[in-house]
A protein has these predicted regions:
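Alpha-to-beta junction loops
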Residues: 21, 118, 185-188
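Short acidic, Gly/Ser-rich segments with clustered Asp/Glu that frequently serve as metal-coordination loops
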Residues: 1-3
Length: 203
């Protein structure tokens, strides 16, 4: 069962130890995934992807970052999207609610997901944007282009946008950088502290 966690192991963010791939969900669901951050979050658990897709379907557009290189994970994601009726409500190149997108640093996984789940938008994560990566997205109908924030300037935004790609960023460190990102014309950003961002001030 796919779970939602950043690392390949549970060591850093739970009271357990071991690789995710070697554990079943019953074992994973017993772990304390909050106390490392603050004792008041001791009841926090690692959620399954199914739980997230079910709970947040009508609340937000869900962006799934695929970290594993297993084909089975993409196939399972498609099954879950069908189960929760995401596919019938999805349009390409949009952040519809309900809706879901798939992103990854792994080019082969983006291509595989695009093949298995062609109905939804896909995006490529990267550190350094290059012409080759722009071409990769254009040639494979990958609509999202997501470099590390500090590698983005106005020329890149114009170049990518003029070619029909949607550009966003990851790696922002503070609210001031969120303001900078939207002034640059980015379509979205990834942060670890969404509660600090006033969305209305960015519109």
């Amino acid at each position: 069962m796919p779970v939602v966690i950043h690392d390949e192991t549970v060591d850093r963010t739970t009271d357990g130890s071991g690789e995710i791939s070697s554990m079943n969900f019953s074992e994973i669901s017993l772990l304390d995934a909050g106390s490392w951050f603050d004792s008041k979050y001791s009841d926090q658990k690692i959620p399954s992807l199914e739980q997230v897709l079910s709970r947040y379907k009508d609340i937000c557009h869900i962006v799934v970052e695929v970290k594993s290189e297993e084909k089975l994970l993409i196939e399972k994601l498609r099954e879950l999207l069908i189960k929760f009726d995401y596919m019938n409500n999805q349009t390409q190149n949009s952040l519809d609610v309900p809706g879901v997108s798939v992103i990854s640093f792994v080019e082969s996984q983006v291509l595989l997901s695009k093949e298995i789940i062609p109905e939804i938008p896909h995006g490529l994560l990267m550190v350094q944007p290059t012409d080759d990566l722009i071409s990769f997205c254009l040639n494979n109908n990958i609509s999202g282009f997501f470099p590390y924030f500090k590698m983005i300037d106005s020329d890149l935004v114009k170049n990518v946008t003029d070619k029909g790609l949607s550009i966003g960023a990851w790696g922002l460190e503070n609210v001031s950088e969120v303001d900078d990102a939207f002034r640059l014309g980015l379509k979205g950003v990834t942060v670890d502290w969404p509660g600090q961002v006033d969305i209305n001030s960015l519109i």
